[in-house]
Amino acid sequence: MHAYELAQLISQHKDSNKLYLEFLKVPDLSMGLYVLPAGGVDAQSPHTEDEVYYVVSGRARIKVADKDRAVQVGSIVYVAKNVEHRFHSIEEELTVLVFFAPAEYSNK
């Protein structure tokens, strides 16, 4: 079993000075915490794995292919592999749990 406390992950993320903190990686799934500052730029590229975002805190917009929508606390967004996507118009620091299936970079 793997178990995590969100408050501890947020603290670890702050200490890491990185935008993305991967905290679980098994063959069929990986998980991480992604934090973007208010007004920040999300420079990610499409991934070779399916992805789910769960917004823990903050407010922004996300563009997935040609669709655009607001996200806020509690929003859940599924992005299929190889689809262009990014957060933008980040109004409040955005903290997002990220789930990749299979594990990130396992389809390269």
Model-derived regions, located:
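Short strand-coil-strand connectors
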Residues: 27, 63-67, 90
